[in-house]
Regions:
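Short beta-strand segments
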Residues: 52-56, 84, 121-122, 149-152, ...
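Class I SAM-dependent methyltransferase SAM-binding "motif I" and its flanking Rossmann-like core
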Residues: 159-203
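Glycine-rich phosphate-binding loop
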Residues: 143-169
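Glycine-rich N-terminal segment of FAD-binding domains in flavoprotein oxidoreductases
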Residues: 45-71
């Protein structure tokens, strides 16, 4: 049976391991609204919370819903801190295809998030290894991530953690698989313009979040989602 719109909310901490709630949605709009409701509830519950944010096509509707609720004074982001999962290596924040630009277009420029509280990995750092360490340190300094939003790639990747990547990694540099490059080609003029490397939070760091919200939409994600939810835990399916 195809799973067309599904949201898996996962809560993990030292006392509650592998407790998962699967929420089915009737449509993409319904999925986006339900995801936004969980995020806004986190912000209302803890106004100074730390959110982990994702890019890609799936969370766009979630961000639009959050913007709408902000404009209606239903949610206040003024004390929230955000950390994005990843960024392409070599793309400046001003590049329209960078994830810095994506977040500005879809969320940051439309709500009252303080710019100094919005963090995206620096894919143009002269010392990428140091940039990775500093990103991890910044997250730790703020007490870790309260709620992490995730999408899932067609090959089961989350963030830019590709199949085969070790789970025991924090923020690091990764070479992108050809399947990921092809999937992201639609955002660029040609496949040649898609960066071949990215800086990404690792699985270990992602799993340290107190709550994880994974959203998936469309039949193209069906196989990866089923493997992640119902298959064995494997580095070949990072989302598992």
């Amino acid at each position: 049976r195809a799973i067309f719109n599904l949201m898996a909310a996962v809560r993990r901490n030292c006392n509650e391991v592998n407790a998962m709630k699967i929420i089915k949605a009737k449509s993409y709009q319904d999925l986006s609204r339900k995801a936004a409701n969980l995020i806004s509830a986190q912000v209302i519950l803890k106004p100074e919370c730390v959110l982990g944010l994702a890019t890609g096509s799936t969370p766009i509707g979630t961000y639009r819903q959050l913007v709408e609720w902000y404009q209606k004074d239903d949610v206040d982001f003024s004390r929230v801190t955000t950390f994005n999962l990843d960024e392409y290596v070599g793309l400046s924040p001003e590049n329209p295809q960078s994830y810095h630009a994506f977040m500005r277009r879809n969320l940051f420029d439309h709500v009252n998030l303080a710019p100094e509280r919005c963090h995206v990995p620096d894919g143009c750092a002269t010392d990428l290894a140091r940039a990775c360490r500093e990103y991890d340190a910044a997250i730790a300094e703020r007490g870790g991530i309260d709620l992490q939003l995730l999408g899932i790639g067609g090959n089961g990747h989350i963030a830019f953690n590709e199949p085969g990547e070790a789970f025991e990694k924090d923020t690091h540099i990764v070479a992108l698989k050809e399947s990921t490059i092809r999937a992201n080609q639609r955002f660029f003029a040609s496949a040649d313009q898609v960066p071949r490397q990215a800086i990404t939070m690792g699985i270990r760091l992602i799993m340290q979040a107190r709550k994880i919200l994974l959203i998936a939409e469309g039949p193209a994600k069906k196989q990866a989602l089923e493997q992640a939810l119902f298959g064995p835990i494997s580095a070949q399916v990072p989302a598992s």
